[in-house]
């Protein structure tokens, strides 16, 4: 199975149109009511079209979550050192704009509320309480899709920290 398992009925698309002065990319975003496919992943990895995955699934559970730190320029070394010092099970990846995504990957799917709360505690411990956390939703009403996160490894961008 995929490392980024999520909602099966929808995904996100991000098309870059420009860049702000602070380095954050601007673009057209849309949620597509179709499942994530291998072809979409290939297009993403080849740098053809960005892919977003919704971490909360149809059972209101998650296999992964993410702390999204939007600070430019990002203090990569400082945050990575703190993650190691605290023994947090997080993987640092560059975001599309050069910010930081700290991913938590799980062996089993857990309630989105538990994943969200755990990541809030981790973010606070790292000194970034109040930053964006995925999953954003802890439950989905019928027909809702939730918020998606741009996936890492788009073309030659969004690399894992240490692979810069």
Describe the function of each predicted region.
Residues 1-64, 72-79, 147-148, 153-156, ...:
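DNA replication initiation on ssDNA origins
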Residues 75-85, 105-131, 157-164:
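Helical (often loop-to-helix) elements that flank the catalytic cores of nucleotide-handling enzymes
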Residues 5-9, 88-92, 130-131:
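Short secondary-structure junctions
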Residues 33-37, 94, 117-123:
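A signal for specific C-terminal beta-sheet/loop modules enriched in small/flexible residues
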Residues 51-57, 80-81, 86-95, 134-141:
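Catalytic micro-motifs at enzyme active sites that drive phosphoryl/nucleotidyl and oxygen chemistry
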Residues 123-159:
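Flexible helix-coil linker/hinge segments at domain or subdomain boundaries
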């Amino acid at each position: 199975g995929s490392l980024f398992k999520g909602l099966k009925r929808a995904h996100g698309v991000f098309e870059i149109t420009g860049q702000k002065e602070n380095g954050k990319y601007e673009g057209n975003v849309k949620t597509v009511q179709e499942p994530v496919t291998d072809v979409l992943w290939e297009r993403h990895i080849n740098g053809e079209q960005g892919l977003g995955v919704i971490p909360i699934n149809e059972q209101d559970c998650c296999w992964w979550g993410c702390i999204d730190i939007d600070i430019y320029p990002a203090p990569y070394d400082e945050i990575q050192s703190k993650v190691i010092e605290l023994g947090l099970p997080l993987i640092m990846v560059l975001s599309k704009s050069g910010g930081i995504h700290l991913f938590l990957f799980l062996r089993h799917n857990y309630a989105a509320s538990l994943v969200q709360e755990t990541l809030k505690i981790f973010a606070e411990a790292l000194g970034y309480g109040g930053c964006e956390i995925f999953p954003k939703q802890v439950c989905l009403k019928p027909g809702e899709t939730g918020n998606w996160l741009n996936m890492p490894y788009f073309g030659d961008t969004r690399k894992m920290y240490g692979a810069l």
